[in-house]
């Protein structure tokens, strides 16, 4: 790493500590040329896979779209904001864990349905009705029957 004071690239790490609940490393460094000390922070850059839409187009992963869909399904339901954030983070982690550079949009939809099934059954049915394009009341009944098993 280049020294911010003199630009030399000979530096050494004096101290390292985990901060931000272990999601960041704070390093104390010293330049070997000018002996100045400074602090750096390191975080992992977590890249989300691209999304392959049903029409074949490719799009960047949009966390706001994911959050909006989940919040719409959970509207006026007794689920905490923390539980929603946990579900979103779990979905993102599972997508990254695939190791793929691109994932189909239906995979994301299925992960959302799994998360909603755990959080709130009514929200699950709401989301499923739109996601699976239910045509009539019979399809609602079939999905509810699956939940009751």
Swiss-Prot record:
Occurrences of domain ATP-cone (ranges): 49-139
GO-annotated biological processes: negative regulation of DNA-templated transcription
UniProtKB keywords: ATP-binding, DNA-binding, Metal-binding, Nucleotide-binding, Repressor, Transcription, Transcription regulation, Zinc, Zinc-finger
Known cofactor(s): Zn(2+)
Molecular function via GO: ATP binding; DNA binding; zinc ion binding
Superkingdom classification of source: Bacteria
Span of zinc fingers (unnamed): 3-34
A matching Pfam family: ATP-cone
Cofactor note: Binds 1 zinc ion.
UniProt cross-references to InterPro entries, sorted A to Z: ATP-cone_dom, NrdR-like_N, RNR_NrdR-like
HAMAP family: NrdR
Function: Negatively regulates transcription of bacterial ribonucleotide reductase nrd genes and operons by binding to NrdR-boxes.
Sequence similarity: Belongs to the NrdR family.
Protein name (record): Transcriptional repressor NrdR
Organism this protein belongs to: Photobacterium profundum (strain SS9)
